[in-house]
Amino acid sequence: MGCIKVISVFLAAIAAVDARAFFHNRGGSDVIPNSYIVVMKDGVTTEDFDSHISTVAATHNLNKAKRGSEAVGHKDSFNINGWRAYNGHFDEATIESILNDDKVNYVEHDRVVKLAALVTQPNAPTWGLGRVSHRAPGNRDFVYDSSAGQGITIYGVDTGIDIRHPEFAGRIRWGTNTVDNDNTDGNGHGTHTAGTFAGTTYGVAKKANIVAVKVLSAGGSGSTAGVIKGIDWCVTDVRSRNALGKAALNLSLGGSFSQANNDAVTRAQEAGIFVAVAAGNDNRDARNYSPASAPAVCTAASSTIDDQKSSFSNWGSIVDIYAPGSSILSAAPGGGTRTLSGTSMASPHVCGVGAAMLAQGVSVAQVCNRLKQIGNAVIRNPGTSTTNRLLYNGSGQ
C-alpha cells in the first residue's frame, strides 16, 4: 500500500512538472523590455481563456501594488484559426505565475521586427516582371494570364500603403493599424511592395484587390505582437468576407526567431490564405529568422538580374523559391516611384504570382509547391542546402 502511495505521489509530481509552460528563446538584443507574448495550448475554450486573462489581471494588479511596477498588463488577445494567444507588459513575478498555468503552452519575449529592404538605387531598370515570365533571362516583356489576380485580395502587412497612388486606383482600401495612429505610409516600403504584388504598372497581379495593414512605423520597425495583431485582423477580415481560398498575405518583414510569429503565419496559411514572406537580408541561414522559418509559408530569397543570389539574401533549406529582389523599381508615396533592394522585394513577386494562381483555381495549399515545381533551376551559388529555383509564372515563354 505504501508503495502505491509513493508511486501516486511520484506520478503527481511528474504531472506537475509537465504542466508548467516553457519560456521560449530568452534574451537577445532585440527584446522589448517587460513585453511578452503568451501562447495557450490547443483546445483551450473561450471560457478558459477569459478565465485565464482575469486571473492574470488580478495577479498583475497585486504584484504591481507590491512592487510599484509600471507594467501595463494585458494588451491584446489573438485568435488565428484556433490559435489563441495574447500580449502584455508584466513583471517577472506575474510571468512566473503565467508559466505555472496548465492552460499555457509557452511564453516568449516580444521583439523588434524590421523591414527586409536594403538600399535605394535611383534610375535602375525594371527587370523583375520580365524575368518571372520567361525561362530565359534578358526579356523585358511581362507575359501573364489575363485574369491577373482578379477576384483575389492581397493584404500588405507592412508600413502602410499610399492608398491614393494611381497604381492602385479603384482596387485598394485601408485595413488596420497596429503600430500608431497615422494611417499613411510614412516610410514608403509598404507602398513599394504593394506596387510589386499588385500595381497597375509595376505589379504582378494587376487586377487583385489590395488591403493596407500597417504593423511597422515610418521608421521601419514594430513588434512581434503588433505583427501578430495585424495577421489576426487579416484572418478575421477574410473570414467575414467569405474569402478564404481567395486571399493572400505579403510579409516583407522579419526579426529573430519567434515561435509565436511562426505559429501565427502558419495558422493563417492553414485557414486558407496564401502567405509569402521575406527570407531576410543578413546573408545567413533563414531558419534563424521569423516568419521566414515557418515551414508552412512560402519563403522568398532574393536574386539579381544575372540570376545570382543577391549578396545580402538569407539562404538555407527553409527557402522555397528565389525571386527578383535587387534593384526593383516600384511605387512610392505621393504618386512617384523608387528603386529598392532586399528580400522584401522578392516576397511580393512571389505573392503576386501566387495570387494569380489562386485566380486560376490553384488551391492555397498547392500554390507554393506549384511555384517550386515550375520554377527555373537557374540560380548560381544559391547557398548551402538552398534551392536554385527562380520564380516563374508559367506563361509558357
UniProtKB/Swiss-Prot annotation:
Q: Where in the cell is it found?
A: Secreted
GO:BP terms for this protein?
A: proteolysis
- Mind telling me which Pfam families this protein's record contains? Inhibitor_I9 (PF05922), Peptidase_S8 (PF00082)
In short, the EC number is 3.4.21.-
The protein's matches in InterPro entries, at most eight in alphabetical order, are given as: PCSK9_ProteinaseK-like, Peptidase_S8/S53_dom, Peptidase_S8/S53_dom_sf, Peptidase_S8_Ser-AS, Peptidase_S8_subtilisin-like, Peptidase_S8_subtilisin-rel, S8pro/Inhibitor_I9, S8pro/Inhibitor_I9_sf
List glycan-bearing residues.
Answer: N250, N393
Q: Does the keyword Protease apply?
A: yes
Q: Name one GO molecular function term.
A: serine-type endopeptidase activity
Q: Which GO terms describe its cellular component?
A: extracellular region
Where do the Peptidase S8 domain residues begin and end? Answer: 126-397
Per the similarity annotation, which family is this?
A: Belongs to the peptidase S8 family.
- Function as written in the Swiss-Prot or TrEMBL entry: Secreted subtilisin-like serine protease with keratinolytic activity that contributes to pathogenicity.
Q: What is this protein called?
A: Subtilisin-like protease 3
Q: What is the lineage of its organism?
A: Eukaryota, Fungi, Dikarya, Ascomycota, Pezizomycotina
Name the gene for this chain: SUB3
